[in-house]
Amino acid sequence: DTFGTDAVRWYLMREMPTGADASYTLERFLARYDELANVLGNLVSRSTSMINKYRDGLVPEAASNGLDAEIDYALESARSAIERLKVHDAFAAAMDLARAANVYIEERKPWAQAKDPELASELDETLATLARVLVVLCALFQPVATEKMDELAVRLGLDQVPTLEKAVAEDMTGKKMSTGDPLFPRVHPESMDTTT
């Protein structure tokens, strides 16, 4: 109950490659859960919060997207991994895209862009890029985190989790985003009951 079935599926997909033996340890499970919370969950929280704070929740229009190459690479890597029956590699590619988006936030510094009216178009590009990444990640993670991606789709202003093809083509401009509790709440191991 603490982690939910999505986290268990994530652990199984990441730690137990198809056709190979694997073992379970609480330490490895917590490490994989932290990956969900600190990388994907943090990206969702930061991105939706900034779009709400700086653009009243509406995804702005932008002339270009800053992470197109990273999105293309993640999609190609995921497709290639699936064809080779390396499902764990497909989800690793999805998580790498989330990491790239977190780096993008640190490099672009939207909080600084928001303070300078002359950087309004750059801020729009930053926020639109993050929205596009989130919709692609929603589709990429859907097979393994079905419940949480349903939640994310609602936050992104979508009727449902899109297929990967629709996610790539989705025009997020004008979509109304909402915020919410962390998708994957941080868990402190010292507070866990490990006797059961």
Predicted regions and their residues:
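Secondary-structure capping and boundary motifs in well-ordered enzyme cores
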Residues: F3, R28-V39, A63-I71, E83-A93, ...
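Basic, alpha-helical terminal appendages of large translation-related enzymes
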Residues: A22, S80, L85-K86, M95-T196
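Catalytic adenosine-cofactor/nucleotide-binding cores of aminoacyl-tRNA synthetases and other
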Residues: D1-S64, D159-S191
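Conserved, charged catalytic cores of large soluble enzymes
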Residues: P17, V44-A78, N102-L119
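Exposed alpha-helical structural elements
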Residues: D6-A7, R28, G66, E70, ...
